[in-house]
């Protein structure tokens, strides 16, 4: 699973997911990308499930870029515990995703395989997504 090696503070506040993504909104490395259309927390387990699903479709050919990283800890209190008595223990790690963010990129496979791989990855995620191509302006990739 993806998670930070070390963090300055063990626990974080939840925060808010207002507005659109500031960076990482264009396909930069691959030929096709999977773009988020809704805000959400994507867990490390969901990212790993997407990665495995894409590898299975692509039959280990081509290349995959994961453009998000789960750097936010989320906590949970034990079952049947009363309220109060401090914040719960860290349960896992999540990536905060805003609309417009590119989640995954694919290259080195034909268009049909890339679409199928990204469609399989999208089925593993709890948000609406769309498949976007890399933009070429004047014969040069942007």
UniProtKB/Swiss-Prot annotation:
Gene Ontology terms: biological process: translation
Pfam families: Ribosomal_L16
Coiled coil: none
Stored PROSITE patterns: RIBOSOMAL_L16_1 (PS00586), RIBOSOMAL_L16_2 (PS00701)
Cross-referenced InterPro entries: Ribosomal_uL16 (IPR047873), Ribosomal_uL16_bact-type (IPR000114), Ribosomal_uL16_CS (IPR020798), Ribosomal_uL16_dom (IPR016180), Ribosomal_uL16_sf (IPR036920)
Gene Ontology cellular-component terms listed: cytosolic large ribosomal subunit
Keywords attached to this entry: Ribonucleoprotein, Ribosomal protein, RNA-binding, rRNA-binding, tRNA-binding
Single Gene Ontology MF annotation: structural constituent of ribosome
SUPFAM superfamilies: Ribosomal protein L16p/L10e
Annotated HAMAP family: Ribosomal_uL16 (MF_01342)
Membership in a protein family: Belongs to the universal ribosomal protein uL16 family.
Function field: Binds 23S rRNA and is also seen to make contacts with the A and possibly P site tRNAs.
Subunit structure comment from the entry: Part of the 50S ribosomal subunit.
Protein name: Large ribosomal subunit protein uL16
